[in-house]
Protein backbone atom coordinates (compact mmCIF):
# COMPACT_ATOMS: atom_id res chain seq x y z
CA UNK A 1 0.00 0.00 0.00
CA UNK A 2 1.09 3.55 -0.78
CA UNK A 3 1.66 5.63 2.33
CA UNK A 4 4.19 8.30 1.46
CA UNK A 5 4.24 8.39 -2.31
CA UNK A 6 6.25 5.16 -2.17
CA UNK A 7 4.70 1.76 -2.69
CA UNK A 8 6.12 -1.73 -3.07
CA UNK A 9 6.31 -3.62 -6.33
CA UNK A 10 5.65 -7.37 -6.63
CA UNK A 11 9.23 -8.10 -5.54
CA UNK A 12 8.75 -6.01 -2.39
CA UNK A 13 11.00 -3.21 -3.63
CA UNK A 14 10.12 0.47 -3.11
CA UNK A 15 8.85 2.36 -6.13
CA UNK A 16 7.70 5.93 -6.57
CA UNK A 17 6.01 7.58 -9.51
CA UNK A 18 8.55 8.82 -12.05
CA UNK A 19 11.50 7.06 -10.38
CA UNK A 20 13.16 3.72 -10.92
CA UNK A 21 13.49 1.26 -8.05
CA UNK A 22 17.18 2.20 -7.79
CA UNK A 23 16.40 5.94 -7.68
CA UNK A 24 13.72 5.43 -5.04
CA UNK A 25 16.07 3.33 -2.91
CA UNK A 26 18.85 5.91 -3.31
CA UNK A 27 16.62 8.77 -2.13
CA UNK A 28 15.40 6.74 0.85
CA UNK A 29 18.96 5.76 1.80
CA UNK A 30 20.12 9.39 1.61
CA UNK A 31 17.24 10.48 3.81
CA UNK A 32 17.55 7.81 6.52
CA UNK A 33 20.51 9.41 8.36
CA UNK A 34 18.59 12.70 8.42
CA UNK A 35 15.40 11.30 9.92
CA UNK A 36 16.59 8.52 12.23
CA UNK A 37 17.16 10.86 15.20
CA UNK A 38 13.76 12.50 14.74
CA UNK A 39 11.72 9.30 14.58
CA UNK A 40 9.79 8.13 17.61
CA UNK A 41 8.16 5.26 15.71
CA UNK A 42 9.12 3.77 12.36
CA UNK A 43 5.64 4.53 11.02
CA UNK A 44 6.45 8.27 11.43
CA UNK A 45 8.99 7.96 8.59
CA UNK A 46 6.31 7.83 5.89
CA UNK A 47 5.05 11.31 6.67
CA UNK A 48 8.57 12.73 6.93
CA UNK A 49 9.61 11.50 3.46
CA UNK A 50 6.36 12.22 1.61
CA UNK A 51 7.67 15.52 0.17
CA UNK A 52 10.36 13.63 -1.79
CA UNK A 53 7.92 11.43 -3.67
CA UNK A 54 4.74 13.49 -3.95
CA UNK A 55 4.20 17.15 -4.80
CA UNK A 56 2.88 18.82 -1.64
CA UNK A 57 0.01 21.25 -1.95
CA UNK A 58 0.90 24.87 -1.30
CA UNK A 59 0.03 25.40 2.36
CA UNK A 60 -2.43 28.19 3.22
CA UNK A 61 -0.58 31.51 3.58
CA UNK A 62 -1.56 31.75 7.27
CA UNK A 63 0.32 28.51 7.98
CA UNK A 64 3.46 29.73 6.20
CA UNK A 65 3.78 32.98 8.15
CA UNK A 66 5.89 32.66 11.34
CA UNK A 67 4.29 34.06 14.51
CA UNK A 68 6.58 37.09 14.69
CA UNK A 69 6.31 38.05 11.00
CA UNK A 70 3.57 39.35 8.73
CA UNK A 71 2.70 38.37 5.15
CA UNK A 72 4.85 41.12 3.60
CA UNK A 73 7.97 40.12 5.56
CA UNK A 74 7.34 36.41 4.95
CA UNK A 75 7.14 37.05 1.21
CA UNK A 76 10.43 38.98 1.48
CA UNK A 77 11.96 35.99 3.30
CA UNK A 78 10.80 33.60 0.57
CA UNK A 79 12.20 35.88 -2.15
CA UNK A 80 15.55 36.01 -0.34
CA UNK A 81 15.47 32.26 0.25
CA UNK A 82 15.94 31.63 -3.46
CA UNK A 83 19.58 32.76 -3.13
CA UNK A 84 20.00 30.40 -0.17
CA UNK A 85 18.37 27.44 -1.94
CA UNK A 86 20.39 27.97 -5.14
CA UNK A 87 23.64 28.02 -3.15
CA UNK A 88 22.93 24.83 -1.17
CA UNK A 89 24.12 22.48 -3.91
CA UNK A 90 27.72 23.66 -3.56
CA UNK A 91 27.80 24.24 0.21
CA UNK A 92 28.60 22.03 3.16
CA UNK A 93 26.05 21.87 5.97
CA UNK A 94 28.09 24.38 7.98
CA UNK A 95 28.47 26.79 5.04
CA UNK A 96 24.74 26.58 4.30
CA UNK A 97 23.92 27.29 7.96
CA UNK A 98 26.26 30.31 7.93
CA UNK A 99 24.63 31.60 4.74
CA UNK A 100 21.15 31.16 6.23
CA UNK A 101 22.20 33.12 9.32
CA UNK A 102 23.73 35.85 7.17
CA UNK A 103 20.60 36.24 5.01
CA UNK A 104 18.29 36.12 8.06
CA UNK A 105 20.38 38.78 9.79
CA UNK A 106 20.30 40.93 6.65
CA UNK A 107 16.50 40.68 6.66
CA UNK A 108 16.34 41.47 10.37
CA UNK A 109 14.66 38.16 11.26
CA UNK A 110 15.61 35.26 13.51
CA UNK A 111 16.99 32.12 11.88
CA UNK A 112 13.86 30.10 12.73
CA UNK A 113 11.63 32.74 11.15
CA UNK A 114 13.80 32.56 8.03
CA UNK A 115 13.81 28.76 7.81
CA UNK A 116 10.13 28.04 8.59
CA UNK A 117 8.64 29.56 5.42
CA UNK A 118 11.28 27.76 3.34
CA UNK A 119 10.49 24.46 5.07
CA UNK A 120 6.77 24.98 4.44
CA UNK A 121 7.35 25.85 0.77
CA UNK A 122 9.73 22.96 0.08
CA UNK A 123 8.19 20.16 2.16
CA UNK A 124 4.62 21.35 2.71
CA UNK A 125 5.05 20.71 6.44
CA UNK A 126 6.33 22.37 9.61
CA UNK A 127 8.01 19.09 10.55
CA UNK A 128 10.59 17.61 8.22
CA UNK A 129 14.11 16.24 8.15
CA UNK A 130 16.86 18.88 8.37
CA UNK A 131 16.14 21.42 5.65
CA UNK A 132 19.55 21.68 3.96
CA UNK A 133 19.85 17.92 3.56
CA UNK A 134 16.23 17.69 2.41
CA UNK A 135 16.82 20.29 -0.30
CA UNK A 136 19.99 18.53 -1.48
CA UNK A 137 18.15 15.21 -1.81
CA UNK A 138 15.04 16.76 -3.38
CA UNK A 139 17.13 18.86 -5.75
CA UNK A 140 17.69 22.60 -5.89
CA UNK A 141 15.57 23.04 -9.03
CA UNK A 142 12.58 21.28 -7.47
CA UNK A 143 12.99 23.27 -4.23
CA UNK A 144 13.08 26.53 -6.21
CA UNK A 145 9.97 25.49 -8.18
CA UNK A 146 8.10 24.85 -4.93
CA UNK A 147 9.29 28.15 -3.45
CA UNK A 148 8.12 30.06 -6.54
CA UNK A 149 4.78 28.25 -6.41
CA UNK A 150 4.40 29.24 -2.76
CA UNK A 151 5.38 32.85 -3.51
CA UNK A 152 2.62 33.00 -6.12
CA UNK A 153 0.07 32.41 -3.33
CA UNK A 154 1.05 35.65 -1.53
Over which residues does each language-model region extend?
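Small-residue-rich helix-loop
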Residues: 1-107
